[in-house]
Amino acid sequence: KNKVPXXQKL
């Protein structure tokens, strides 16, 4: 779960 402005679904 990462809150990164960009949209990284890893």
Swiss-Prot record:
Report the locations given in the UniProt record.
Answer: Mitochondrion inner membrane
Identify the GO cellular component terms for this protein: mitochondrial inner membrane
Entry's family note:
Belongs to the cytochrome c oxidase VIIa family.
Q: In which pathway does it act?
A: Energy metabolism; oxidative phosphorylation
Q: Does the keyword Cell membrane apply?
A: no
Annotated organism of origin: Oncorhynchus mykiss (Rainbow trout)
What does this protein do, in the record's words? Component of the cytochrome c oxidase, the last enzyme in the mitochondrial electron transport chain which drives oxidative phosphorylation. The respiratory chain contains 3 multisubunit complexes succinate dehydrogenase (complex II, CII), ubiquinol-cytochrome c oxidoreductase (cytochrome b-c1 complex, complex III, CIII) and cytochrome c oxidase (complex IV, CIV), that cooperate to transfer electrons derived from NADH and succinate to molecular oxygen, creating an electrochemical gradient over the inner membrane that drives transmembrane transport and the ATP synthase.
Q: Which UniProt keywords apply?
A: Membrane, Mitochondrion, Mitochondrion inner membrane, Oxidoreductase, Transmembrane, Transmembrane helix
**Membrane topology for this entry?**
Single-pass membrane protein
MF (Gene Ontology): oxidoreductase activity
Keyword Protease tagged: no
Q: Which GO terms describe its biological process?
A: oxidative phosphorylation
Subunit field text: Component of the cytochrome c oxidase (complex IV, CIV), a multisubunit enzyme composed of 14 subunits. The complex is composed of a catalytic core of 3 subunits MT-CO1, MT-CO2 and MT-CO3, encoded in the mitochondrial DNA, and 11 supernumerary subunits COX4I, COX5A, COX5B, COX6A, COX6B, COX6C, COX7A, COX7B, COX7C, COX8 and NDUFA4, which are encoded in the nuclear genome.
The residue ranges crossing the membrane are none
Report the protein name in the record: Cytochrome c oxidase subunit 7A-heart, mitochondrial
